[in-house]
Amino acid sequence: MNKSELKPALVFEQFAKINEIPRPSKHEENMIEFLKSFGEAHQLETLVDETGNVLIRKAATPGYEHAETIILQSHMDMVCDKLVDVDFDFHKDAIQTYVDGEWLKAKGTTLGADDGIGCAIELAILASNDVEHGPIECVFTRDEETGLTGAHGMKAGFMTGKMLINLDSEDEGEIFVSCAGGQTTHATFHFSREEAPAGYFFMETSLKGLNGGHSGDDINKKRANAIKILARFLFLENEKLDGSLRLVSFNSGKMHNAIPRDGKIVFAVKNADKEQVRADWNIFASEVEDEFHVTEQAMLFNMSSTDAAPVIEKAVADKFVMALQAVDNGPLTTCQDEAIAWMVETSSNVASVMTDENSINIVASQRSNVMSNLENMTNTVKAAFLLAGAEVTVGDKYPAWKMRANSELTDLAVKAYEKLFGKKPLVKGIHAGLECGLFSERYPELDMVSFGPTLRNVHTPDEALLIPTVEMVWDHLLEILRSVAK
């Protein structure tokens, strides 16, 4: 299969156009202009709100003018991540895609199918002339990935439909009817630097090759967190060396909503201890590889000497390492309802650590389907860093989307799927944030579902789109549109 053979052709044509447009989160200006031009070129009513969300209206197919208006919604931004040895500028370069069997992938970068494929499906609906449907509103939101900015900023009345299909889910055959709420915690350790004592040897250790992944949807997959592993080594080694280890820097993770998959630390030890530290690192690496032998089979541990540099003041460095060792990470509780007892209810992810000249900045994200548990988890993370002397701020929370007791749209979506594929879809909740949570606050009567084609390894350069599922989602969506229209 080559790219010219991908089906539905109209969807993949639109996706190819989208991937020519730089659209990092918070920098969607080019995408907004593209959407405006698209709407105008097709003579469709096109609106842009003050936040930058775009809405394009398409009139009903003749004969279906009195049908219920249905909203199709996706987000226009993408997570920007690349392999360390790939030269790529997400602010100006086009995503380079290729076909690998049944999967569409990108060359060394994120693919942008989260949520570019959702946008492409909407544009294909707007451009098509042979789809039966009632009135449609296609909505494209800004900055979903780093703050849900578009959904936060959207005012009541911008959308007018009473049913909404969110096209930002990642497992074909699953229809999502609820999602987790979330919040982000930021901790900063301020410090001064000083010269290391005489007789110290400087070392750099790195960890890479982890799977990483989405910090909500993938948090229960037993994947390693690079930050927690590196912090664990520092804590253990400093204990062994009677507190003599001196830290220079700790850097790992780039995004608040991804499990960090690589990292690097620089530190100094006494000359007399350097060979023991090398031996300890090798033993530690073997132990961690054994712990994750099923889920992480490409871990790469490295240690080398490096140039001398000013070290972080001892008291701050030690408290920073202890805080990282102590802070909760991973899935913490599962749902209490027996029907969904397998699903993660509350989790936390230490997402990034960045060191500059006089501070270390940490980002951790918390999620829960129960808002009181979200508040408690956020306070637990906050307390760990406050006890260690950090300056802590907490970002705006976004709400959970609660399952609707009697959802006409869910019933229509299930029946349409059964009609097409002869089996029931899985109706479930997701332990990740969807914009549906915010929409449910502004539009409490809105009946919503979320589904999409199968994606794997989102938010990483291994992101992949399962090609056959795009056509399945397309057919499913068209059947729902026909059902609503009739």
PLM regions: where:
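Active-site-adjacent substrate-binding region
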Residues: 225-227, 232-250, 403-446
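Acidic/His- and Gly-rich active-site-bordering loop/insert found
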Residues: 2-102
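His/Asp/Glu-rich mid-to-C-terminal helical/loop segments that flank catalytic regions of hydrolases
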Residues: 36, 157, 222-240, 272-274, ...
